Regions:
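Conserved class I S-adenosyl-L-methionine
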Residues: 194-203
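Short glycine-dipeptide loop
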Residues: 194, 218, 224, 328-332
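Class I S-adenosyl-L-methionine
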Residues: 85-86, 92-195, 214
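Mobile active-site "lid"/loop adjacent to the S-adenosyl-L-methionine
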Residues: 234-235, 275-334, 377-378, 382, ...
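Conserved SAM/SAH-binding loop
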Residues: 204-205, 291
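S-adenosyl-L-methionine
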Residues: 230-279
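Polybasic, low-complexity RNA-engagement segments
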Residues: 21-129, 141-143, 147, 353-393, ...
Length: 682
């Protein structure tokens, strides 16, 4: 039975059972303590290797084969098929966003234009019939795979249109190019729109995006729940900003930079305004591992694979999972959840009650007592299986193993855990401390923490009224009314209704500037940032909604609408909205330059002239369209231009069924100087 309140999905060593286990200046800044266990390892747990795998042709490892054959994980009659799949390239897989009108249209177009087509091409001197098939275990028919690796797809001229479609729609957040097995863990977590979710080791972010999508499953309404996407590596955190914040277009996510095994206690206000320790409703824990399941795409592993890599990471895995369990709601002991009835078409193997412990030479040790003294630092007690009675009580068979030869995927290990009682062990810091909201809870250990990386600019919320922010706002907006200036004039300029005053908006400006982006976050993200910014390094949060720009004297408000956050702003607007036909929208998007107003229809020309210069939203609800298109635009004195980047322009052309123009736009043949000019202005 799936827990409806507290789940944590945990991926441990792939194939191997293990115990749960901008100021632009680089300098040391206060925040978390670095975990030296990971200094030499990347996300996968493997040391960084040069990208020369295209020269690796021998996909064979005697050490790997000895280990897995000794374990008996793979039935003898399946062994050759298992090795054959491991030695072949991994198919490219992707999924469409659920509960999105544009995603529904894109999915239908994909099925009509590409799914039924059969294409022949040559890959490594072999004639290949390219097939696209639906991944039958993924819900609602939203996931697909192509029987070509990513590099081969990119190089085939016969498949250029399909490749362009995938790249453009990925950049716009309509689909996610994601390994099939990576899609599985979030599907077992039963995400609801009010849940607080922690992704402890989030980079590169594909599963984080999945979690965010599930948070938005109820439709267009802004969820009250949120996702904290954390990663140890500072550089990978900025990849997360692009993957999780930009592509998901969600105001319900924040990126943090912290060692997952030392993720600090964080605090949120309760209904009485008192700060209490946050216990997350769901936690995804994709721990560093030996990457056995990635052999099909990480070819260097064939040379580098070693059982000691898994042993070296075991303690770290356990520390991360234990910390995650402490952060999970209603603290206590855990049990493995039986998810055998979920995703019935997903072929999986059950977890094992017993496994063998080998050293680097292939010697098997039945118990810790048999391990030589010189190996006990590497082969420790925690690596050995429990007694059979304990294994039965723990229901280890409820773990899931995904093997490559079952459904032509990578490999994965998954365990879904649920809290059911109190822990018999403690980290020594488990009290739910209650203090008045806003009071600093910084402990001596937190004060002494230091973190490598870039010093982040502060988060400044526009609807706060403390003295420090008032002084800052008076300088920034050159108005005695401070942040009230923004809300008053923007509300009046765009005709915002009363709900706009409740928006949680922030800036990341350390110094006064004529440029600046305003981000939208939901209320709980605001509380998280305000009450925990001194406890954990926060990289970024929120959805770009407004941007300050240089304007002429005739424009009363020097803020423009940003495409990313337009869907949350338009329902509040009653002014500066322009209805536009499909043909005129196509004309605007395909234009290399801004369009002169005199070249538009008389009706549209009249509407735009009446609105006047400045930012506006163009809305196209064509009769035969299955969704409404909303485009942030800039109206000049005599011209109009949509404020879209190349990918968004190509995306709208796809949606408006002008595929050739979309391909030309993406390749660069359809872009012009208007984007560069507008970017220079703002």
């Amino acid at each position: 039975m799936i827990c409806r309140k507290q789940n944590v999905a945990v991926k441990l060593n792939k194939f191997k059972i293990s115990e749960m286990g901008k100021s632009k200046r680089h300098r040391k800044v206060k925040f978390g303590k670095r975990n030296n266990d990971l200094d030499a390892f990347g996300k996968s747990g493997m040391k960084a290797l040069p990208k020369n795998d295209r020269f690796i042709t021998d996909r064979h490892s005697s050490r790997f084969e000895i280990f897995y054959r000794t374990q008996g994980f793979i039935p003898e009659e399946e062994w050759e098929l298992f090795l054959k799949h491991l030695a072949s390239d991994l198919p490219q897989s992707f999924r469409f966003v659920e509960n999105s009108k544009e995603g529904t249209v894109a999915l239908q177009m994909f099925k009509e234009k590409f799914l039924s087509k059969v294409t022949r091409c040559t890959v490594e001197n072999e004639d290949v019939i390219v097939k696209i098939r639906e991944i039958n275990w993924y819900p609602n028919g939203l996931a697909f795979e192509i029987n070509l690796p990513k590099k081969a797809l990119r190089r085939q001229t016969e498949l250029q249109s399909l490749h362009n479609f995938l790249v453009v729609e990925t950049a716009c957040g309509i689909l996610s190019r994601q390994e099939a097995v990576s899609m599985i863990p979030p599907l077992f977590m039963d995400i609801k729109s009010h849940h607080s979710i922690l992704d402890m080791c989030a980079s590169p972010g594909s599963k984080t995006v999945q979690l965010i999508e599930m948070l938005h499953a109820d439709g267009e309404a802004l969820p009250t729940g949120f996702v904290i996407a954390n990663d140890l590596n500072n550089k990978r955190c900025y990849l997360l900003v692009h993957q999780s914040l930009r592509r998901s277009s969600s105001p319900c996510c924040v990126i943090t930079n912290c060692d997952a095994s030392q993720f600090p206690d964080v605090f949120m206000p309760d209904k009485f305004g008192k700060l209490t320790k946050l216990k997350f409703d769901r936690i995804l824990c994709d721990v560093p591992c030996s990457s056995d399941g990635t052999l099909r795409k990480n070819l260097n592993l064939w040379k580098e694979w070693h059982v000691n890599q898994a042993y070296a990471l075991h303690r770290l895995q356990r520390k991360i999972v234990e910390r995650g369990l402490h952060l999970l709601a209603t603290g206590g002991a855990v049990e493995l959840v039986d998810v055998g009835n979920q995703l019935p078409q997903l072929v999986r193997s059950k977890g094992f009650h017993h496994w063998k412990v080998l050293d680097a030479e292939g010697n098997v040790y039945a118990s810790p007592d048999e391990v030589p003294d010189e190996l006990k630092s590497k082969i420790h007690n925690g690596l050995f299986p429990p007694d059979e009675s304990v294994a039965e009580k723990l229901h280890l068979e409820r773990c899931l193993r995904i093997f490559p030869h079952h459904q032509n995927t990578g490999g994965f290990f998954i365990a879904v855990l649920r809290k059911v009682g109190e822990f018999s062990w403690s980290t020594g810091n488990e009290a739910d401390v209650l203090v008045p909201s806003g009071q600093n809870l910084k402990s001596s250990s937190e004060q002494n923490r230091r973190y490598d990386g870039i010093k982040e600019d502060p988060f400044v919320f526009l609807n706060d009224d403390n003295n420090e922010l008032i002084q800052y706002g008076q300088l920034l907006f050159q108005s005695q009314s401070c942040f009230a200036f923004f809300f008053h004039f923007v509300r009046e300029y765009f005709g915002m209704d009363d709900r706009f005053s409740n928006f949680s908006l922030l800036m990341r400006q350390k110094e006064v500037s004529k440029k600046g982006i305003i981000y939208l976050v939901n209320e709980n993200i605001k509380h998280f940032i305000k009450n925990n910014e001194h406890r954990i390094k926060i990289i970024n949060a929120g959805l770009r909604t407004f941007s300050r720009c240089s304007v002429s004297d005739s424009v009363r408000v020097d803020f423009r609408l940003v495409q990313d956050g337009l869907r949350y702003v338009i329902p509040l607007m009653s002014k500066r909205l322009v209805n536009i036909s499909k043909d005129e929208l196509l004309k605007l998007i395909k234009s290399k330059e801004s369009i002169l107003l005199k070249d538009l229809s008389d009706e549209l020309h009249s509407q735009l002239k009446q609105i006047g210069e400045g930012s506006a939203a163009l809305v196209c609800g064509a009769e035969n369209a299955k969704c409404t298109f909303q485009v942030a635009s800039w109206l000049g004195r005599c011209s109009v231009a949509p404020h879209l980047d190349k990918e968004n322009r190509a995306h709208f052309l796809f949606m408006l069924d002008d595929l050739q123009a979309a391909y030309d736009m993406y390749k660069g043949n359809g872009t012009g100087g208007v984007d560069a000019k507008l970017e220079a202005v703002v």
